[in-house]
């Protein structure tokens, strides 16, 4: 019996198709979701952990600090966030939108600023005696053990800061930012901040804008979260004052993350969760 080359390629094509189908059958996709929106902070806000001087007010604000000297306040979302998966190596995409206001009695002397941060689940306020660290970091030099990423909105110039005065910064494991851009504080006015992380490119991007004003302040950098923070983290805000001061408020906060997981079907342990405020 003869066996033509055309028959060989037909059989090879069929075999490859069957292999691809079987390979895909053995893969299971799952997505873990975390999503919440807080449009008004209640005085009995059960999904937040308060540290230091942070409180919620009768007017619906999350007040991190009052306009007093030497104050630190932090508020964390109570449920840990699965930011990357150790079994698959997959990392979550996320975005968070928040509205803040910084109000100082004297607009020329404002300190020190606030930060959105991602940190270990057991995170505690850092460097309480030095307000320039914003209650998030304990050093101006890189310290891998901190396992923290932050977006700082800095109102006071310290020795480790860039030459520009007030700035937005992306910080990794220390208070000295890896990227910065200047911004103009509108005393007492609400500003919106959008923070996004793209797991495919490892790009963390920040956009700050004041409603009704034309300028936007934009910043981005590569931040490989899987190499920096633990698999499970907490997210939240921190603010601090020193000899100079201001009231630091959060007026609105939403967060959404998606962790797409691909498992082997033979050993799949698939879960999907949605958390809401």
From Swiss-Prot:
UniProt GO MF annotations: D-mannose binding; metal ion binding
Function, please? Lectin that may be involved in a cell recognition process.
Residues engaged in binding Ca(2+): 154, 158, 161
Family stated for the protein in its record? Belongs to the leguminous lectin family.
Claim: Transport is one of the keywords in the record = no
UniProt-listed CDD domains: lectin_legume_LecRK_Arcelin_ConA (cd06899)
Q: Which residues form a coiled coil?
A: none
Signal sequence, renumbered to the chain: 1-30
Which Pfam family is one of those matched by this entry? Lectin_legB
| Binding positions for Mn(2+) per the UniProt entry | 152, 154, 161, 167
Keyword check for Calcium, yes or no: yes
Q: Which PANTHER family match?
A: CONCANAVALIN A-LIKE LECTIN FAMILY PROTEIN, LECTIN
Which residues are glycosylated according to the annotation?
A: 143, 269
**Extra info from the record?**
Binds one manganese (or another transition metal) ion and one calcium ion. The metal ions are essential for the saccharide-binding and cell-agglutinating activities.
Query: What is the name of this protein?
Result: Lectin 1
Gene Ontology biological-process entries? response to symbiotic fungus
What gene name does this entry carry? LEC1
Q: Keywords in UniProt for this one? A: Calcium, Glycoprotein, Lectin, Manganese, Mannose-binding, Metal-binding, Signal
């Amino acid at each position: 019996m003869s066996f033509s080359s055309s028959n060989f390629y037909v059989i090879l094509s069929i075999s490859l198709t069957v292999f691809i189908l079987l390979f895909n059958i053995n893969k299971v996709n799952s997505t873990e979701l975390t999503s919440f929106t807080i449009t008004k902070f209640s005085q009995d806000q059960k999904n937040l952990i308060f540290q230091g001087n942070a409180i919620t007010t009768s007017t619906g604000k999350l007040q991190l600090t009052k306009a007093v000297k030497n104050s630190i306040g932090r508020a964390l979302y109570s449920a840990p966030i699965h930011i990357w998966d150790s079994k698959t190596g997959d990392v979550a995409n996320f975005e968070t939108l928040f509205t803040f206001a910084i109000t100082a009695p004297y607009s020329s002397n404002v300190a020190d600023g606030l930060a959105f941060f991602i940190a270990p689940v057991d995170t505690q306020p850092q460097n309480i005696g030095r307000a320039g660290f914003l209650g998030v970091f304990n050093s101006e030099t890189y310290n891998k053990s901190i396992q923290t990423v932050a977006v700082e909105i800095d109102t006071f110039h310290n020795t480790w800061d860039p030459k520009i005065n007030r700035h937005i910064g992306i910080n990794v494991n220390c208070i000295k930012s890896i990227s910065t851009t200047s911004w103009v504080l509108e005393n007492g006015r609400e500003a919106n901040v959008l923070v996004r992380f793209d797991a495919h490119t490892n790009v963390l991007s920040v956009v700050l804008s004041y409603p009704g004003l034309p300028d936007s302040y934009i910043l981005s950098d590569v931040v490989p979260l899987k190499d920096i923070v633990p698999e499970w983290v907490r997210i939240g805000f921190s603010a601090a004052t020193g000899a100079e001061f201001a009231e630091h408020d959060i007026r609105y906060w939403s967060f959404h993350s998606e962790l797409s997981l691909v498992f082997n079907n033979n050993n799949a342990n698939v879960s999907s969760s949605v958390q809401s405020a």
